[in-house]
Amino acid sequence: MLVYIAGSGAMGCRFGYQISKTNNDVILLDNWEDHINAIKENGLVVTGDVEETVKLPIMKPTEATQEADLIILFTKAMQLPQMLQDIKGIIGKETKVLCLLNGLGHEDVIRQYIPEHNILMGVTVWTAGLEGPGRAHLQGVGALNLQSMDPNNQDAGHQVADLLNKANLNATYDENVVPNIWRKACVNGTMNSTCALLDCTIGELFASEDGLKMVKEIIHEFVIVGQAEGVELNEEEITQYVMDTSVKAAHHYPSMHQDLVQNHRLTEIDFINGAVNTKGEKLGINTPYCRMITELVHAKEAVLNIQ
């Protein structure tokens, strides 16, 4: 199969690297010039659990011409419509598109470009880091769940899961992936924005009594909005999952902290807490915590003059 990685940041590099070890062809797509040039000139330098340099083709999305069998989306949420527009030329009648983006509502965007028959939605707990252009740091293990959005095309989902398992990516075909997507979004909604605004680690947030109160209110808002949309969510179970994750990730600054505080980049807030607030408004459900957090993050972006 010919697999394109649409958005070859840290996670895209992990998936591209691991899939390239199977008998499938991989092409990385990205718009970051320095990253593209580094990989073209020196290969992708992998550090962490393995130290290796691999030659992988990389190009801008608009330069890709060969029809894809599978496209894995790893772009930033706000760049998704542009990416789908840019890769229209490599999408054939049977091209499968797997979305592994953080956050909520991406399927609504993807449906505008791809028939439901070919859409796969997933969620992953793999992690990865970029040490600079063309340098990926891959450590630890992870897993992912995915599902075909078309109930009559489950075979496609199983086929993609098999391919990912050959790449040791620990994929599970999930008959009901949407609650898992919401659960991960809730983890991000309790940790990402809050740690970015408070400039603290996950452990520091959860050690604060007021921080914990806020976390529980955010979880409640995610759960009531998700349930109103027909998603099976158990507040007690999700709270436990968030607490467990906070212990494992106690020393980490989450990705939104990296974006907002460390690198002064736009955040994905509109697809996490912002999405819950927007959905809540449509459903007549008040979500004051998610609304305020979204406004604060946007205000911080404006204060820092991030565009």
From Swiss-Prot:
Residue ranges crossing the lipid bilayer per the database entry: none
GO molecular function per UniProt: 2-dehydropantoate 2-reductase activity; NADP binding
Principal localisation: cytoplasm
Pfam family, one: ApbA
InterPro entries: 6-PGluconate_DH-like_C_sf, 6PGD_dom2, ApbA, Ketopantoate_reductase, KPA_reductase, KPR_N, NAD(P)-bd_dom_sf
Catalytically driven reaction(s): (R)-pantoate + NADP(+) = 2-dehydropantoate + NADPH + H(+)
Ligand binding (NADP(+)): G7, S8, G9, A10, M11, G12, N102, A128, E268
Similarity-based family: Belongs to the ketopantoate reductase family.
Protein name in UniProt: 2-dehydropantoate 2-reductase
